[in-house]
Amino acid sequence: MAHTLYIVATPIGNIEDITFRAVRILKEVSLVLAEDTRHSRILFDAYNIATPMEAYHDFNKEKVTPKYVEFLKNEGDIALISDAGTPGVADPAFNLVRECVRQSIDVRAIPGPCAMITALISSGMPTDHFTFQYFSPKKSAQRIHLLEKLKHE
């Protein structure tokens, strides 16, 4: 029987902004995948998390995704974390999650901080409808074109 991939939200600025459940999951899984293990080590040290950690990022995701799918099938549970906030929002988590869903491996989200929602609710703008755009284009003309397109959504 396959194990579970946990998508665990991590703090986005204040190290205390993590749930009890997230800390428990990070301690209980067999392996944690992190965008930047050096950055995540700070969180691990603060909460005495001793779980083995490996890198999962944009530069290795294609190569290592099959390895972690096999790990989930045969060895144990994995927690996937990003540098800050909720994995899967404009980061490499999507690749592993998609492959797990394709192969009927259990995927569970452990909610917590999300920069997008934090910014929205503190903006004073209506929250019943919004559009998310990751990074805007660098060139001014492309940015203006994108904003013109989005203003009617």
Language model: regions and residue ranges:
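Glycine-rich, flexible N-terminal cofactor/catalytic loop recognition
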Residues: 1-59
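Amphipathic coiled-coil/heptad-repeat helices and related helical stalk/stem segments
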Residues: 18-19, 64-65, 93, 142-143
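Catalytic-core regions built around general acid/base machinery
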Residues: 22-28, 67, 71, 96-103, ...
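Glycine-rich loop at the start of a catalytic domain that most often binds anionic cofactors/ligands
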Residues: 45-50, 72, 93-94
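Conserved helicase motor
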Residues: 55-63, 135-140
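Short phosphate-binding loop-to-helix
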Residues: 58-73, 92
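Short glycine-cluster motifs
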Residues: 73-133
